[in-house]
Amino acid sequence: MILMFDMPTDTAEERKAYRKFRKFLLSEGFIMHQFSVYSKLLLNNSANTAMIARLKENNPKKGNITLLTVTEKQFARMIYLNGERDTSIANSDSRLVFLGEAFPDET
């Protein structure tokens, strides 16, 4: 899922709403690609539907929020015209991720 948003930040109340929404996105596991462009890997349509429901519950009163659902394969084919691809584990579509130190070679 790719989420793009544009929210006003003119008043203290609007800035507070912006910070609250951004914190919500991060707490839900979204990764920031650019300012106001976030993504989250959702493994199936049920997870996608549930995430949309949570986003609707935490929808700020002002601004524009756009969602785009793409497959893992489509996301992996994203073209970077400038800058580098984020290769962190958090941005991986791998089903199995090993965390911690590498095991020594037992040969």
From Swiss-Prot:
Protein name: CRISPR-associated endoribonuclease Cas2
Binding-site residues, Mg(2+): 6
Family, similarity comment: Belongs to the CRISPR-associated endoribonuclease Cas2 protein family.
E.C. no: 3.1.-.-
Cited InterPro entries: CRISPR_associated_Cas2, Virulence_VapD/CRISPR_Cas2
This protein's UniProt keywords: Antiviral defense, Endonuclease, Hydrolase, Magnesium, Metal-binding, Nuclease
GO biological process terms on file: defense response to virus; maintenance of CRISPR repeat elements
Purpose of the protein: CRISPR (clustered regularly interspaced short palindromic repeat), is an adaptive immune system that provides protection against mobile genetic elements (viruses, transposable elements and conjugative plasmids). CRISPR clusters contain sequences complementary to antecedent mobile elements and target invading nucleic acids. CRISPR clusters are transcribed and processed into CRISPR RNA (crRNA). Functions as a ssRNA-specific endoribonuclease. Involved in the integration of spacer DNA into the CRISPR cassette.
Keyword ATP-binding recorded: no
NCBIfam families in alphabetical order: cas2 (TIGR01573)
Listed Pfam families: CRISPR_Cas2
Cofactor: Mg(2+)
Quaternary structure and partners: Homodimer, forms a heterotetramer with a Cas1 homodimer.
